[in-house]
């Protein structure tokens, strides 16, 4: 874990310390540990969020530190160990954390009509043996795949559910080889000839174009998905409602004012690919991701080999029951607001 305090003007505190319980049982918040999704390297991912964390620290009157890790798996484990107080997560990771009752959604990126939509993509080299989507789907065993972690919506879940499984292709087993990494790492793998095709998304590929123009010029998009569920901002569920409301107010108001400070905040948001800032949200924002996971589960069950039809039907019934429970829990959050 790489922790970085972005405000040294606050009262002394211990990096990574667990919040102490108050007399009423709720944690006493002495710092905010912000979980950072791995975009490229840990230092790069952390640096992108540092300006917003510094402003958050001033607004909340608390030190804010970045918990930056190299993989989705490590970030997931940190959430499970209560080492993270808030985070910007993939919809898949957020759904898992919310259903485990560890986190709750407080905000998500604002979208407006006419702005470019965030989509999953597949990348291949412009000059190379693989040129088309048809060639990929016809003989997946010929090609080396670079993909995201299974917790990544655009790096795994969406390509699997919208493209590969409908064509009877399991990403994990049908390709000649596979490399799992960040969106930056998968794009570099194809650009440098270490893989033939990579999962990615429009937002991170645009960032890749700016950071690696030479390598990006070697790549082409051969498939684009429908818009996937958005990534939300989550906070620990056991934190006091007053703190959650203050944090949500900061996020929703960030970059919305006038003057030099608001102008600077809007520049920060542009770097984070959130040009229009954040809007208030609750756990019901994860309903699209729950539906996507449900569809993926059904696709896998229907395409798998079973000892008999009854076994398949039992699996499908369990998937239906789990999805119904998720929907009920996520809708309950919206109703209680």
Name each model-derived stretch.
Residues 1-2:
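N-terminal export leaders
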Residues 16-36, 136-144, 324-336:
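Immediate post-signal peptide segment of exported/extracytoplasmic ligand-binding proteins
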Residues 19-95:
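Extracytoplasmic small-molecule ligand-binding "clamshell" domains
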Residues 29, 33-57, 69, 115-188:
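Bilobed "Venus flytrap"/periplasmic-binding protein-like clamshell domains
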Residues 29-30, 40-41, 47, 51, ...:
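An extracytoplasmic/periplasmic, membrane-proximal ligand-sensing/linker region
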Residues 33-38, 111-121, 213-248, 266-283:
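Periplasmic-binding protein-like
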Residues 73-87, 100, 118, 183-198:
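Short helices/loops that flank or line small-molecule/ion binding pockets
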Residues 139-146, 150-250:
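Pocket-lining segment of extracytoplasmic ligand-binding domains
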